[in-house]
């Protein structure tokens, strides 16, 4: 009882103690990115590790590029994961021993795929990184714009505000997909069914 009384007295006294002034430098440097794409409610600009606390725009753009790329890959991964979990598989065999695609499990696929198949996957990823998923023509209007003057799908018909809104939607969906694919992998490791039976 004495301990509870003493603790409440200390807490009460602490309420009236002068507050320590917060450093203003981090707030001032982060204000440079408050209006950037992705600084959206409810969090606003969120940089808990202080990766861009120095206000370096080039570093911010590089991190944004990486975030967009990982978000896009994660969105594809979630869809692919759910499609194969629903039982949709490629026909045929994966190797000469007769192992079918249907026999290969989701996460354990890396253990089941032959070494030659993994080399092909890595080569394909390298081709994408070096020749497809980048601004090859210098025509990019924003970070992550990989149209390269060839693909439009009506993007240029939108006004600037709509384009910004759609880019923000893509960024948020990518963030959610990154969490989603991680959750799907955890569920599989726990042995939890991903789809309703």
From Swiss-Prot:
Residue interval of the organelle targeting sequence: 1-31
Domain of life (superkingdom): Eukaryota
Subcellular locations according to the entry: Plastid, Chloroplast thylakoid membrane
Keyword Cytoplasm: no
Keywords for the protein's UniProt record, in alphabetical order: Chlorophyll, Chloroplast, Chromophore, Light-harvesting polypeptide, Membrane, Photosynthesis, Photosystem II, Plastid, Thylakoid, Transit peptide, Transmembrane, Transmembrane helix
Gene Ontology molecular function, alphabetical: chlorophyll binding
Annotated Gene Ontology cellular component terms: chloroplast thylakoid membrane; light-harvesting complex; photosystem II
Residues spanning the membrane: 73-94, 114-133, 174-196
UniProt topology in membrane: Multi-pass membrane protein
Function statement: The light-harvesting complex (LHC) functions as a light receptor, it captures and delivers excitation energy to photosystems with which it is closely associated. Energy is transferred from the carotenoid and chlorophyll C (or B) to chlorophyll A and the photosynthetic reaction centers where it is used to synthesize ATP and reducing power.
Similarity comment text for this entry: Belongs to the fucoxanthin chlorophyll protein family.
Name this protein carries in UniProt: Fucoxanthin-chlorophyll a-c binding protein D, chloroplastic
Organism: Phaeodactylum tricornutum (Diatom)
Gene responsible for this protein: FCPD
């Amino acid at each position: 009882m004495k301990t509870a009384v003493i603790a409440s007295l200390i807490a009460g006294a602490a309420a009236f103690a002068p507050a320590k002034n917060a450093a203003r430098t981090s707030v001032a440097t982060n204000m440079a990115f408050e209006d950037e794409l992705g600084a959206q409610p409810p969090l606003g600009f969120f940089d808990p590790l202080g990766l861009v606390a120095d206000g370096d725009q080039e570093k911010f753009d590089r991190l944004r590029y990486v975030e967009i790329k990982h978000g896009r890959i994660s969105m594809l991964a979630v869809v692919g994961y759910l499609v194969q979990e629903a039982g949709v598989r490629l026909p045929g065999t994966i190797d000469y021993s007769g192992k079918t695609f249907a026999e290969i499990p989701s996460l354990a696929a890396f253990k089941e795929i032959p070494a030659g198949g993994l080399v092909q996957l890595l080569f394909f990823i390298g081709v994408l990184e070096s020749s497809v998923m980048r601004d090859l023509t210098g025509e990019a209007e924003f970070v992550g714009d990989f149209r390269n003057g060839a693909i439009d799908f009506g993007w240029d018909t939108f006004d600037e505000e709509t384009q910004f809104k759609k880019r923000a939607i893509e960024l948020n969906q990518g963030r959610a997909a990154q969490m989603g694919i991680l959750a799907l992998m955890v569920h599989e490791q726990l042995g939890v069914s991903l789809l309703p039976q």
